[in-house]
A protein has these predicted regions:
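A short, acidic, amphipathic alpha-helical segment used as a generic capping/interface helix at domain edges
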Residues: 169-183
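Short, surface-exposed connector motifs at secondary-structure boundaries
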Residues: 9-11, 31-39, 106-109, 130-136, ...
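Hydrophobic faces of well-ordered beta-strands that scaffold small-molecule active sites
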Residues: 13-17, 36-42, 61-67, 110-112, ...
Length: 225
């Protein structure tokens, strides 16, 4: 059988589900319904985070840890007490990042949670890049940091899947991930931990390979970027 992440020559599609670990029921739904090729991203604020990571890995999933970063509308939109701030000194950025990275073990990389203001901070992203490189941790960009730095392993999302929470909108976004894969050999989509998103992704994942694509974990895309 083909190992996860092994290229078979087909266009690669990868999906990340973010925001897991905060709601136990939704997190269990993800673990029970999604195939192992789907990458699961957990909030660092999750209770029982390590247990969730262990359960995800036991089911064959790759795991990412979310790093909350300052959005444009902060503090009205506040991703939590360890948010990486755009105007923070590099030492403070690294201190917060180290707290996040120390919350669990067994993840291959991190992904930004929000952060459209922080990623434009050269000093902030440089500090993040250095800390991740020292640990050998990948940086996956949710799509807003494509012009900024990251870790040594890197992939950038092509398509948010559930900006509009309706089955037709999510299905259309998944088709755009496929289109990106046809155009450049790989496509990466990101959905959040909503029951509807999980159902639509599970349904799509069950038949996407029959249409000529390879469903791959996010790290497989990061390695060839």
């Amino acid at each position: 059988p083909l190992r996860l992440g092994t290229c078979n020559g087909r266009p690669r599609v990868a999906i990340i589900i973010g925001g897991l670990g905060l709601n136990p029921d939704i997190t269990r739904q993800a673990l029970e319904t999604l195939p192992p090729q789907v990458t699961l991203a957990f909030s660092p604020y999750s209770p029982n985070l390590q247990d969730w990571i262990n359960r995800a890995r036991e089911r064959g999933h790759e795991v990412l840890l979310e790093v909350p970063m300052e959005p444009e509308d902060y503090p009205e939109n506040d991703p939590g007490p360890y948010t990486l701030r755009a105007r923070a000194q590099p030492a403070e950025t690294v201190r917060r990042l180290e707290w996040i990275l120390g919350r669990g073990a067994g993840y291959f990389g991190v992904i930004n949670r929000m952060g459209d203001r922080f990623v434009r901070s050269p000093g902030g992203m440089s500090a993040v890049q250095g800390a991740l490189r020292n640990r050998g941790v990948a940086f996956i960009d949710s799509g807003i940091a494509s012009a900024s730095g990251g870790g040594d392993l890197r992939a950038s999302a092509d398509q948010p899947l559930d900006t509009v929470l309706s089955p037709p909108a999510i299905d259309e976004a998944l088709l755009r991930v496929e289109a990106a894969a046809l155009q450049k050999g790989q496509g990466l989509g990101i959905a959040q931990a909503y029951p509807l998103s999980l159902r639509q992704v599970a349904s799509w994942a069950a038949q996407v390979e029959s249409r000529g694509y390879q469903l791959a974990p996010a790290s497989a895309l990061a390695r060839i970027r």
